Amino acid sequence: VNERPALGLIVVAAAGFLGIVFDINSVFGFAAESFLTIERSSIVTTDDGDGDGGELTAELDVEGVQIPTNGTHGAFGYGMITDDGDETILVAHTHAGLLDSEAQRFIEDPNWHNHFVKFGDVEHCGEDQGIVDITWQSPGEVGIDDNIVRISDVPTGEIEGQHSSMTGESLSFTLGEAVSDVISFKLDSVFGDDGLEAVCVTDIRSAEEVVNLD
């Protein structure tokens, strides 16, 4: 498995992940992470009929009363997996301490934003998946309203993006329209003798209910 793209991301993310992945107090961790339980997700996709794909809109209702937006609960997010794309996953996530998106104003900005990503087998992640490709662009819009995530205007057809390492590498992503799973996840970092070696996707949980409203 080619791990090079993940290492490109790591160059940008190293300082941030080191500072944020251990922020959650272990004593109150269970209660604090209720926002990782997606009780219901509603998905709508539209197709403009020109063969270039359409747009995806989604609403995720999570357990608890408030999804963190200030970066104090570490790096976590939500994702949508489709059956008819090119293994591209739409993720919306938050993190303070790293700058990996055009939607962030500065490195400590925990502003929620979207990415297209691809997960893959990464040696340092063991049985977990690792990030092997990720866009600098933030496709569509995402907003948090108490315990509800609203995502809109996400293109489902092929798009060209720039790798978030800002190397200028061009990437192609096709999300697709047939959403098969909606997930929550946390991000973890792996360090070696030479520093940060991988960004792993951990604690993946599927939504309790996924409703496609097409």
Regions found by a protein language model. Give the residues of each.
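Secretory targeting signatures
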Residues: 1-29
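A broad structural signal for short, well-ordered beta-strand segments within beta-sheet-rich domains
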Residues: 32-46, 51-56, 123, 166-168, ...
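A generic structural signal for beta-strand entry/edge sites
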Residues: 51-59, 146-150, 170
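Mature secreted bioactive peptide module from preproproteins
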Residues: 94-95, 109-130, 145, 167-169, ...
